[in-house]
């Protein structure tokens, strides 16, 4: 019995030992340094950015009351959300004629480009920062000895900084257009039944855009985080060391010349 149980116990312990070895190899103190701590913030705020934008949904509406007593008051409720292709969202406009009951209408505008770019950038930032944290914590010696890793990290960090600025600004402008297109007054202005004398239209509840506004704020926070991290990543590159060597070179030579003059 003991001979049969020993292989099974060894098989059970081997995955645990591998996990323990992996956790022991992680240098958690790297998270206390700016290079690792900012990466954690970038990872978190990337989740907040694409999560708040990608999960947004709202509704707008209006009330149409026909002067014809045969028809009741019609309530129009239009649901919209990410990716904000408003021109594909349908709603039924009531008609006050006796012949037909309603007409299919669409919201105006397509704002999917800035929204999808914003969410895609957040997802890429999430995966890159997660991979960078693994390198910092597990393979930091390889990161410091191989000069290509800091150079690649610096170039990618600068690129993400630029893209976050563009994405946050573009999505901020797109969100402003979304607010204008989904405003209840815009909804009533687009319905022809509201321009005649056969009906009276009133605006419904204004859409709550709080989560979408926060997503724009998270976008600019990501920009500042990536911009601030550029300096700390640059310090790990060979370019920073060359700048220090060039700055110290003339001072050391002048000190040597002064020592030679004093000896003479």
Swiss-Prot record:
Q: Pinpoint the MARVEL domain residues.
A: 30-238
Q: What PROSITE patterns does the record point to?
A: MARVEL (PS51225)
Topology versus the membrane? Multi-pass membrane protein
Tissues and organs where the protein is expressed, per its UniProt entry: Skeletal muscle.
Q: What coarse category fits the chief subcellular location reported for this protein?
A: membrane
The segments annotated as topological domain Cytoplasmic are 1-33, 138-150, 235-264
What Pfam family is a match, any one?
MARVEL
| Entry keywords, A to Z | Glycoprotein, Membrane, Transmembrane, Transmembrane helix
Q: Which residues cross the membrane?
A: 34-54, 117-137, 151-171, 214-234
Comment field (misc): Was named 'Mitsugumin' which means 'triad junction' in Japanese as it was identified in the triad junctions in skeletal muscle.
Q: What is this protein called?
A: Synaptophysin-like protein 2
Organism of derivation? Oryctolagus cuniculus
Gene that this sequence comes from: SYPL2
């Amino acid at each position: 019995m003991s001979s049969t149980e020993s292989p099974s116990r060894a098989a059970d312990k081997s995955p645990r030992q591998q996990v323990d070895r992996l956790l022991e190899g992680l240098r958690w103190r790297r998270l206390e340094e700016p290079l690792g701590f900012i990466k954690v913030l970038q990872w978190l705020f990337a989740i907040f950015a694409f999560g708040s934008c990608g999960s947004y949904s709202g509704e707008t509406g209006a009330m149409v009351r026909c002067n014809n007593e045969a028809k009741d008051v019609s309530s129009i409720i239009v649901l919209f959300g990410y990716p904000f292709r408003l021109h594909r969202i349908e709603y039924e406009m009531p008609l006050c004629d006796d012949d037909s009951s309603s007409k299919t209408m669409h919201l105006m505008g397509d704002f999917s480009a800035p929204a999808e770019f914003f969410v895609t950038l957040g997802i890429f930032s999430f995966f890159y920062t997660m991979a960078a944290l693994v390198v910092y914590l597990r393979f930091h010696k390889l990161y410091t000895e191989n000069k290509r890793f800091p150079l690649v990290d610096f170039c990618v960090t600068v690129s993400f900084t630029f893209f976050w600025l563009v994405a946050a600004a573009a999505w901020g402008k797109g969100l402003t257009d979304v607010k204008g297109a989904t405003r209840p007054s815009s909804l009533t202005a687009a319905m022809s039944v509201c321009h005649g004398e056969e009906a009276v239209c009133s605006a419904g509840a204004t859409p709550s855009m709080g989560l979408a506004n926060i997503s724009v704020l998270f976008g600019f926070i990501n920009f500042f985080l990536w911009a601030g991290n550029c300096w700390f990543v640059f310090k790990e590159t060979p370019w920073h060391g060359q700048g220090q060597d060039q700055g110290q070179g003339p001072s050391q030579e002048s000190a040597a010349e002064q020592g030679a003059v004093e000896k003479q």
